[in-house]
């Protein structure tokens, strides 16, 4: 028992260190793509949004297949190869002077992500007990916020000199992560079943509750995608200065440090997972609606802060609900399939909002994308409410607690 507990502790420490490299490497590059290509080079927001959406669709849309391979081959080869492929994608992005090259670099980044993301997430479910998932996800969110601010501050500083430096820095960080995983990651098997790839996929598709929940979250991810596209563009529009973009992520880091753990502990005690997810989503919708009308930077940052608070409330509950519905016999297949909503949400969120931004700019109607985003959020909220009304996900968590008591 001690050996198992020690393995879990060491595994969680590894996940936290690995997550640091991946998150910093991501945030050094991706939040600045829209600023560099749209604001500095003058490319259309739809074009850049399409490239970002393509990256999201490929990475998350192919997740079910990469997850099935990870169930069969184990986590290590998938994670290591994925990290190195993303390194190559960032190197190509550094010389992207045409839309074709930008799309190619995003596709390679996506391919890398689709290889390493499902098995990394499955390792969390394997190494963390169900009743500890909510708090561990909160720890990861806290780390994500701190690493995001490090990445974006570093990226914006490098962007003053050269976008190539931004991309090379991201590439180096992912290369280090790849070497670290090749060196230290044990050859974990993340599925307890020896079923074929197709059997793993069929197992997921037969779980109707999980499938409906996943696709309903598409709208949630459409809203979340704006952190990488529309929110940075709006801050640059209102402030007129590139340096103010980093304040988005500074605010996120401060709010995460102050609120993630207290909100998680308090809400776990008094509210169901379903309630926490819906309250967080409502907060996000309320914050997004007036953004196109705001002309003052301080007011804009307050609304963005409210958006982050909504995410802080919703995200641990969303992650835990998804994890509770997975089958330990096909963990990566489940995680991979769950990325489909992120794929659809990212594709529509990036390209759709970029297209609406271009139309709104032409028609002098800057509120257009924010109105549509709010409507999408309300539809998503209604879909979640209908699911939660007829089925209590909280019962799954209670079953896990009962197992804990028996142990």
From Swiss-Prot:
- Major subcellular site: membrane
**What protein family does this chain belong to?**
Belongs to the major facilitator superfamily. DHA1 family. MdtH (TC 2.A.1.2.21) subfamily.
Where are its TM segments located?
13-33, 88-108, 139-159, 163-183, 210-230, 247-267, 277-297, 298-318, 340-360, 368-388
The listed locations are:
Cell inner membrane
Q: Domain of life here?
A: Bacteria
UniProt xrefs under CDD domains: MFS_MdtH_MDR_like (cd17329)
What protein am I looking at?
Multidrug resistance protein MdtH
Q: Name one Pfam family in it.
A: MFS_1
Q: Which terms does the record give in the GO molecular function aspect?
A: transmembrane transporter activity
Gene name of the record: mdtH
